């Protein structure tokens, strides 16, 4: 689906954060979620949907069970700073495995900060209010 991204005033001139995470358990299970694959998927999606100023935030080898991850924390800091207008992830499980924390970030924190959120594989786009319909994959 190719569509031109209409930039809102809130996300105009702000970074598009591409967030990747892979835990050691994911890697050992042979999942096709390698960091390289996630980066390519996120870049392809962002470019085909008109997102610009792409910046990767990566946590390789970190569990989604906690949110004390360097890439995640750096991204949150830049959201607080007002530098990031959009966050794109492969799927909701890349954000984390704790349903309450994921819900807080996607439904409260990002919205309060005026950050547009997209989870590609889950069909989540906060601009069209799909967040509350999604279950995080285990």
For the regions a protein language model found, what residue spans apply to each?
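Short, structured surface patches at the beginning of a domain
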Residues: 1-137
């Amino acid at each position: 689906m190719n569509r031109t991204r209409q930039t809102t005033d809130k996300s105009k001139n702000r970074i598009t954060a591409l967030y990747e995470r892979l835990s050691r358990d994911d890697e050992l299970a042979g999942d096709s979620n390698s960091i390289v694959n996630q980066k390519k998927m996120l870049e392809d999606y962002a470019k085909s949907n008109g997102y610009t100023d792409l910046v990767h935030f990566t946590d390789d080898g970190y569990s989604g069970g906690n949110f004390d991850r360097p890439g995640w924390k750096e991204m949150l800091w830049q959201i607080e700073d007002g530098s990031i207008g959009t966050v794109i992830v492969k799927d909701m499980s890349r954000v984390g495995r704790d349903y309450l924390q994921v819900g807080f970030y996607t439904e409260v924190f990002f919205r309060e900060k005026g950050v547009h959120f997209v989870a590609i594989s889950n069909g989540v786009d906060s601009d069209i209010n799909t967040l509350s319909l999604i279950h995080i994959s285990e």
